[in-house]
Amino acid sequence: MSQRTQWLRLSTRVLPALIFLSQFFTSTALGAQGDKLTKRVERAAEVLTELVSVPDKAPPSALLSEATCVAVVPGVVQVGLGFGGRAGYGLASCRTGTGWSLPTFVGLKGGSFGLQIGGQSADVVLVFVNKDAGRLASSTFNLGGGASVAAGPLGRNVSAETDYRLKSEIYSYSKSKGLFAGVDVSGTKWELDYSANRKAYPKADDMPRGDDAKSVTALLSTDGAKAPEIFRPFLQSLVKNIGEGTVK
């Protein structure tokens, strides 16, 4: 038997096995990535419930009713000892004329979030109240630089006449030990997670994918009624805990 014939026979046996292994590991990796995003969404939904679970330690109802966008970043962790060594990933949605928008995945880097040195994690919630929040949220900027940010007030019964709305565009909350508290996150960098958006949104002519700034702007201005199933827990939690997504 010639060397060529032997090689051809071997290749017909080995090549299918290599193709199978390649497909197996690719699908396994994609599945793991999908599970990771699902857990991120589910945890963000839980954080919103925890945010309002203790009335005396929850954001004022008046503030939540005025929210134009809400971002939740669970499990921000300290990844280094210096400033800027903290990072976390979550998602955001904005109020539209008819409901909460298609969400976008986002990330926060730097800042303090109320964390202490030692690897502690914190859940962070940002409440946007400026009317142009959708445009702002679809860009990369520094909190406190590109947009004013302040520690959020607490107490569900704070009057709607309170002047908090005149002082800042974004109000921030962090929970690192038990209850939420208002925390100043000035200096934190807001980023868009295009890679996660590409994994979550299908290629479809009638839906943006959030894989660039323009597309994220489209996400945050499009009603989330047709959002992929992965986002359902988060959108339902927004309605239940923050309020309807319609604009007043």
Regions found by a protein language model. Name each.
Residues T26-A32:
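Signal peptide processing junction and immediate N-terminal pro/mature segment
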